């Protein structure tokens, strides 16, 4: 056990922010704190590292109460990377990382050869050896974060606490930082506790997530168990977006406004199209989908009306009839370019029906493929080269 809390209350002055915190965090775990802004994630972290005194309860580092540890022992066991920018003046990267060796340098504070070796090893581990002679102030945000991680590594801690370590970083540096943290937990047995805002990254990187809301811990456990659609909706109170555990991310919900579009899709052909239409506030009906495929999950997450069948089931006549009825309520029908197999052949019937009814039918297929599938009817179709062209054309129809 690295960190244990018993009936912990954290806050400022006499005002509690989060109460009744009871946690048991193990060696080698990557622990993520998730919650809305102002929920108390940073307050919990600042209490764990003694920047704030607990308002009640206890924090244990190993078997020792936190307040019983000397500053020297605390520095040997715990490294901290906060969001507050540091202003190191003319210190270069090597000097910054060497600061992490200070708890190990003895009375004189003079680094030994072993300390220099560990600084170089820390820089290499975060892929920042090429930065060692540069001034810290010259670095990009992503490079600075890697250097601060190297400083934390140089301390050789059992626990690293980070406040929003991926904020202000581009996609590449976010992934790089999280992979470094994963390497620390798995390779060196270091416990990492970090506040995070990216639900999808927390789901993929963390061993444990702690959900914080309304002055209490809403849930704590593995992200696979805790980051369910319902719990994330409760945590963030999202009305115009939906988190999907199956997709591992957030989808914008389709909003009624610009008109109703029927999308004939399947086998992942519709997913990007659904997102594009939802972004432009079109109402979406889609089918006929198998409930085991990604198109079904994306359509469900964005709030589209779905005509579907169970996995690997044939499309029955009554399901086709329902889809045909809904097509009549749409001014535009889109063929997403779905592949044709034995189970989904009735979807071709949907497109032919829309063409016979004189509806506007668009397709993302090339003309030769459309002609093979729909025969002479294909001449009535509007062909779009990409999503931009499709969305532009559909918006003109509803103007």
Where are these predicted regions, by residue range?
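Catalytic Walker B motif of ABC-type/P-loop ATPase nucleotide-binding domains
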Residues: 160-164
């Amino acid at each position: 056990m690295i960190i244990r809390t018993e009936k912990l209350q954290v806050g400022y002055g006499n005002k509690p922010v989060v109460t009744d915190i009871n946690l048991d965090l193990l060696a080698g775990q990557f622990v993520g704190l998730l919650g809305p802004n102002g929920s108390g994630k940073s307050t919990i972290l600042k209490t764990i590292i003694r920047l704030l005194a607990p308002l009640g309860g206890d924090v244990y580092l190993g078997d020792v109460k936190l307040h019983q540890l000397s500053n020297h022992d605390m520095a040997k066991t715990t490294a901290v990377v906060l969001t507050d920018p540091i202003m190191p003046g003319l210190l270069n990267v090597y000097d910054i990382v060497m600061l992490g060796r200070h708890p190990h340098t003895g009375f004189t504070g003079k680094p030994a050869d072993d300390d220099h070796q560990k600084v170089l090893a820390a820089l290499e581990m975060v892929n920042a050896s090429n930065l060692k002679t540069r001034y810290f102030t010259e670095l990009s945000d992503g490079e600075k974060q890697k250097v601060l991680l190297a400083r934390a590594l140089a301390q050789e801690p059992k626990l690293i606490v980070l406040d929003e370590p991926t904020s202000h970083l581009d996609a590449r540096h976010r992934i790089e930082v999280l992979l470094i943290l994963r390497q620390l937990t798995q390779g060196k047995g270091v416990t990492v506790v970090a506040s995070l805002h990216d639900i999808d990254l927390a789901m993929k990187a963390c061993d444990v997530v702690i959900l914080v809301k309304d002055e209490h811990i809403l849930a704590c456990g593995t992200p696979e168990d805790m980051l369910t659609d319902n719990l994330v909706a409760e945590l963030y109170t999202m009305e115009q977006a939906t988190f999907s555990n199956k997709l591992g991310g957030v989808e914008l919900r389709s909003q009624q406004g610009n008109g109703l579009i029927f999308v004939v899709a399947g086998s992942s052909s519709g997913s990007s199209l659904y997102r594009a239409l939802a972004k432009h506030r079109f109402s979406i009906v889609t089918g006929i989908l198998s409930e085991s495929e990604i198109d079904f999950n994306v359509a469900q997450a964005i709030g589209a009306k779905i005509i579907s069948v169970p996995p690997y089931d044939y499309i029955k006549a009554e399901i086709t009839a329902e889809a045909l009825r809904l097509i009549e309520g749409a001014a535009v029908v889109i063929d997403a370019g779905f592949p044709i197999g034995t189970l989904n052949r009735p979807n071709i019937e949907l497109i032919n029906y829309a063409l016979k009814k004189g509806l506007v039918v668009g397709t993302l297929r090339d003309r030769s493929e459309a002609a093979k599938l729909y025969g002479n009817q294909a001449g009535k179709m509007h062909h779009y080269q990409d999503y931009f062209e499709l969305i532009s054309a559909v918006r003109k129809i509803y103007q």
